[in-house]
């Protein structure tokens, strides 16, 4: 069973009197920085001078520095810029300025796990990965709750790396909900596999294929949209709130029977085997290598695929249907 930490298992004392540099002030960086400050901790921001993040952080009342200067001032460095920007920023601005004994925190294990970033031996390297977007991290904190998180230690120079990681988790509100101990490898691989075969790739293609089948059979695109996309949220909300079995108890008997008998024929063992192959590419590092090379070329294939997704017929129909639902 997974080890789960709660509020009582963590102490902010590990961070009291220390300077925390949040590198990046996007949605996740802003949420975590504000939560840490509201928890009574000393937070500064590292950003590009004159950029949108720089100005946003100043408006929120933070002291803002160039990344290298912020790192040099910090006892704790939180790497909250996008994954693919991190290696360059690390080499040029973070690594040369790290203090001996500093704690370096990541919100995702990608760069450490796939060796795109190699930390020096004289720092702690930890991960606190909220399992929700920055907006939820902030809103739940303000409501007196928290978003669950994963926590991991990659390098324990101080002998107290886990204590520091749990303190960060507490500072952003995650221990209110619960923090699960994991490893950088497990977090990275399960995150990528989940995105590819279920959350982004799987759901997206399931919805699109269902829409295509209904339209090809002569049904109105607008009706098809509601059946395969709009109502997907209602089902996912039930699953999120009650679990799969609870969802089944929340739909009609007709939906139960149809789903339980036809679902396994559509998502069958052949699909499961394809999922295994996709997961194996993640675990071997093949996907990471492909994505890094694509990014370094300027991501031409990604742009092409995004354009294709934008031009799928479900998008035009969806734009009109969302006007009905939410207004122009």
From Swiss-Prot:
The keyword NADP applies. NADP(+) binds at residues 25-28, 48, 53, 83-86, 134. Residues 183-328 form the KARI C-terminal knotted domain. Its cofactor is Mg(2+). It catalyses: (2R)-2,3-dihydroxy-3-methylbutanoate + NADP(+) = (2S)-2-acetolactate + NADPH + H(+); (2R,3R)-2,3-dihydroxy-3-methylpentanoate + NADP(+) = (S)-2-ethyl-2-hydroxy-3-oxobutanoate + NADPH + H(+). It holds the Pfam family KARI_N. InterPro entries: 6-PGluconate_DH-like_C_sf, KARI, KARI_C, KARI_N, KARI_prok, NAD(P)-bd_dom_sf. Binds 2 magnesium ions per subunit. The active site is at 108. Residues 2-182 form the KARI N-terminal Rossmann domain. Pathway: Amino-acid biosynthesis; L-isoleucine biosynthesis; L-isoleucine from 2-oxobutanoate: step 2/4; Amino-acid biosynthesis; L-valine biosynthesis; L-valine from pyruvate: step 2/4. Its EC number is 1.1.1.86. It comes from the Archaea. Belongs to the ketol-acid reductoisomerase family. Involved in the biosynthesis of branched-chain amino acids (BCAA). Catalyzes an alkyl-migration followed by a ketol-acid reduction of (S)-2-acetolactate (S2AL) to yield (R)-2,3-dihydroxy-isovalerate. In the isomerase reaction, S2AL is rearranged via a Mg-dependent methyl migration to produce 3-hydroxy-3-methyl-2-ketobutyrate (HMKB). In the reductase reaction, this 2-ketoacid undergoes a metal-dependent reduction by NADPH to yield (R)-2,3-dihydroxy-isovalerate. This is Ketol-acid reductoisomerase (NADP(+)). The lineage of its organism: Archaea, Thermoproteota, Thermoprotei, Thermoproteales, Thermoproteaceae. The gene is ilvC.
